[in-house]
Amino acid sequence: DEGIFVNPVVLSEEIRRNLENDGVTIRNYEDVYDFVRNLADGSKAMMNLNVVNSKLDAVVPAGVQVIDKVDPTNLPKAMKNDREVENFRIAHIKDGAAVTKFMRWVKINVGKIDMDEISVAEKLEEFRREQPGYICPSFEPIMGYGPHGAIVHYSAPEESCAKLEPKSFLLSDTGAHFIEGSTDITRTFALGELTEDEKKYAVAMAEPMN
């Protein structure tokens, strides 16, 4: 019984039909726990214990042999053909152009017009929409000004998002889906004169990457 666990909403009718015609059973993503919990004694389950979530590991029955190995599909998925490599390059050139225009716009206009964490995310989206083949964001944009830049996966609340001023840092962690491929680009912009502490910490963070 071959099957996949997936959120059904991400499958088009064509993909669903092709999978079913190939004998692949489509199961709801959350059903994986019950599936593993009901594995028969003496069966085997391969999982990478370094990355599998603890909930899934915990429901494996005592009579099931766990084979601790890296997912064998990882390496083939990582191998890209020439067309894929070229498309990634094109997607990143497009995204780089949009982010560069955004960076210039922010630095020219900060302190002159009203900006906050949400409005600058919308502006970057506007620049991305100018690029041919743009589809949509590849994930929810993260724009963190000042101390908010240190919050992992920060999401600016509409009622209290920070106003940008010509000082401190703006962390921009965003991405895009283009017809050629997807991107994820993170940059930190100095919006004005920095304090001595900000300079010191920025250098300390950058040095290990050299």
Question: Which functions belong to the PLM regions below?
Answer:
Residues D1-N210:
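Active-site neighborhoods and metal-handling regions in enzymes and metal-associated proteins
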